[in-house]
A protein has these predicted regions:
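Structured helix-beta-strand junction loops
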Residues: 33-34, 69-70, 91, 108
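Amphipathic, hydrophobic secondary-structure cores in small proteins
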Residues: 94-96
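Acidic, PIN/NYN-like endoribonuclease modules and their adjacent C-terminal/linker elements
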Residues: 1-2, 101-136
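Alpha-helix capping/helix-boundary segments
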Residues: 12-13, 41, 80, 100, ...
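Acidic catalytic patch
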Residues: 65, 70-90
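Short, well-structured N-terminal submotif of metal-dependent ribonuclease cores
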Residues: 1-38, 52-65
Length: 136
């Protein structure tokens, strides 16, 4: 699998911090195969880690540096914004979920690893939502 094939949602990456070893190991396994994320995913991960989990900034930065080393990072652009609004209109997803989906579509990803969206759903005949914690 190439980096462009898999796109990671924040909901999955946060399991790197989980006490659930099986889920943390699964995310590490997927990341070892590389993937793509957006700047939004980095921001959401940092916000949850700092605010909700109370982690120290240096620790959060270290984890994000590791993720960035194995994932391509795509920017948020006006194109991403416009595509996200079209996804909101067509599918009814929240704006923030739609921004992640739009970034994955623009990156050419085939799989979106997410725990927040419907497992197996195909978006725009290109992107399949995969919950990596559903039995394989």
């Amino acid at each position: 699998m190439s980096a462009v094939d898999a796109f990671f949602d924040t909901s999955v990456l946060l399991y790197l911090l989980s006490k659930d070893a099986a889920k943390a190991d699964r995310v590490e396994e997927l990341l070892a195969a590389r993937g793509t994320i957006s700047v939004q995913v980095l921001n959401e991960f940092a916000a949850v880690s700092l605010r909700k989990l109370g982690m120290p900034l240096p620790e959060v930065k270290e984890i994000l540096d590791t993720v960035r080393a194995v994932c391509d990072v795509v920017p948020l652009t006006v194109e991403t914004h416009d595509r996200a609004l079209a996804i909101v209109a067509r599918y009814g997803f929240s704006l923030y979920d739609s921004l992640v989906i739009a970034a994955a579509l623009i990156a050419g990803s085939k799989r979106l690893y997410s725990e927040d969206l419907q497992h197996g759903q195909v978006i725009d005949r290109q992107l399949r939502v995969v919950n990596p914690f559903v039995s394989r």
